[in-house]
């Protein structure tokens, strides 16, 4: 299945028919009208405030910005929300400073975070027409990136160590040598589905189309490109140049 996801964003940014404010509203706010724009601008400004008063103001006002917020959610400073009405956060969740929750898309579900989830400092959850769902008690450590053009789903009690990268989609076609790769269609392979109680070590990469069974472990630095059954322990990665894009058969190694 191919979707021209990234190319469409580039076209939107270059659309001369829209004002700068209109482009900002479409990419960040996700709802029409000046009222939605002003509400978004004011409430996201609260992310800058320090101390107890900043925490209290975010706790009081962020539920009106987001689609759903449970009791006792802790919002850190300098958070970024895009299309916030499609972001749902369960009770007792903590979102650390500088995290990004981007539910961007026209018809997607957006981001759904379970109860007592931890989203670490600088973590990025980003949708490009896709969806992201995190089960209860899951921990997404600092600087992890979850990028979804289709679907990323994590079960309960999952633990992602720092700098993990999960990408559902993002496999660009590169058959057309006359067109920049970033402007060619993005190929989706079914998303990423991870069962309960899975541990991904630091720097693990999980590619599109992968299913990881419950209670599995991937060692630090692993690249997971195939399905893993329940209770699996996987580690390692290897990249080889296998062919030349210009044709002519396998490339020299």
Q: Across the structure, where does each feature detected by a protein language model lie?
A:
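Terminal amphipathic alpha-helical/low-complexity segments used for targeting or macromolecular assembly
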Residues: 1-72, 157, 164, 169-173, ...
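Short conserved AdoMet
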Residues: 70, 139, 211, 229
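Flexible, glycine/small-residue-enriched loop-and-beta-strand segment within the central core
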Residues: 80-89, 94-206, 210, 237-238, ...
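A generic "structured core" feature
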Residues: 153, 217, 222-223, 231
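Glycine/small-residue-rich hydrophobic helix-like segments
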Residues: 210-211, 216
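Short helix N-cap motif at coil->helix boundaries in the Bergerat
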Residues: 226
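Conserved active-site beta-strand element of glycosyltransferases/polysaccharide synthases
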Residues: 234
């Amino acid at each position: 299945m191919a979707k021209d996801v990234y190319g469409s964003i580039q076209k939107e940014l270059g659309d001369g028919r829209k004002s700068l404010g209109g482009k900002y509203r479409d990419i960040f706010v996700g709802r029409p009208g000046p009222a939605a724009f002003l509400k978004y601008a004011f409430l996201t400004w609260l992310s800058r405030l320090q101390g107890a008063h900043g925490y209290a103001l975010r706790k009081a006002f962020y539920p009106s910005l987001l689609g759903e917020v449970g009791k006792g959610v802790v919002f850190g400073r300098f958070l970024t929300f895009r299309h916030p009405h499609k972001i749902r956060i369960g009770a007792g969740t903590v979102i650390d400073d500088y995290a990004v929750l981007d539910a961007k898309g026209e018809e997607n579900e957006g981001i759904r975070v379970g109860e007592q989830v931890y989203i670490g400092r600088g973590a990025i959850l980003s949708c490009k027409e896709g969806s992201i769902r995190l089960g209860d008690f899951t921990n997404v450590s600092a600087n992890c990136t979850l990028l979804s053009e289709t679907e990323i789903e994590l079960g309960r009690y999952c633990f992602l160590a720092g700098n993990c990268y999960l990408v559902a989609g993002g496999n660009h076609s590169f058959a057309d040598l006359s067109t920049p790769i970033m402007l060619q269609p993005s190929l989706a392979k079914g998303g990423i589905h991870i069962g309960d109680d899975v541990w991904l070590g630091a720097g693990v990469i999980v590619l599109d189309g992968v299913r990881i069974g419950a209670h599995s472990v991937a060692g630090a630095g692993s690249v997971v490109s195939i399905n893993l059954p329940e209770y699996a322990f996987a580690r390692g990665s290897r990249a080889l140049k296998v062919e030349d894009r210009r044709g002519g058969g396998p490339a020299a190694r």
